[in-house]
Amino acid sequence: MPIRITRRDFATLAGGFLVSPKAIAQTDTPLVTRAIPSSDERIPAVGLGTAYVFDQDDETTRSKADAVVQALIRGGGRLIDTASTYGDAESVLGKVTAAAGLRDKLFIATKLESPDAQELKRSLARLKTARVDLLQLHNVRSKQQSLERFREWKGQGVCRYVGITSTSRRDYPAVEAVLKREKPDFVQIDYSLDNRGAEKSILPLAAEVRAGVLTAVPYGNGRLFRLVHGKELPDWARVFANSWGQFFLKYLLGDPRVTAVIPGTGDPSHMTDNAGAMRGPLPDPDQRRRMIEFVESL
């Protein structure tokens, strides 16, 4: 059975998760933000995913979530992505943001599996808000799926933007069809340094229809950390990355079609490190090609 190494395990075993802080200043360089194509509103380019990390509504999880959200904000971030199907994540997020009075500081995105008005009502109640910033149709699988109801809700002020999501390459044909026809404000897709299928299809189409792109599972569900276990960050990468986490995120942000990356974490130190990917230079096309070659050589 293969040994599974989490990011926490990796950080401990590496004995030095971060490269020297002199490599890249984390606070005195401009924050990387990206414009939402349909509105030109700018949002910070690193957010927070909540799948599997905030799914239990208990005191321990709420305390952890509060620390992570505070780390996101301190790092310059605003975007938090959740879903009605992520266990108790909406409830945890709602309680944490309400208790700390953080709602107006955040860009909240959630997802529904279908245009069900009652499920929307329950999501808003769990999030303790009357409006979300982004409402997404989750896990698009059919070319016939529509955003008609979502647009109605947008017109009613329930959300500011609408989007679609998928993390399955077999569903890309359906995603492409809905993206072309519905022209949503956002598409959320699986995209990582070792999973680049979206570069050939979804990203070009998103640019064509002026949809923002959110990248889910940017660490490939932990695959990338397992690949680099026991390896030091190459010297050539230290000009733009302070850690392996930033290396992986900055590959994605090096593509200007990507609006934001949304790695999930329940660890505030990892959130701080993730937010650091919004500081300092991004890799240029030649450096991105070298990053691909490096990962493919492992």
Describe each PLM feature range:
Residues P2-D104:
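N-terminal binding-site loop/beta-alpha segment at the start of enzyme catalytic domains
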Residues P30-E41, L124, K200-E208:
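Short amphipathic alpha-helices and their capping/turn segments at secondary-structure boundaries
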Residues G47-Y52, T82-S84, T110-L112, Q136-N139, ...:
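A cross-domain feature marking catalytic cores of carbohydrate-active enzymes
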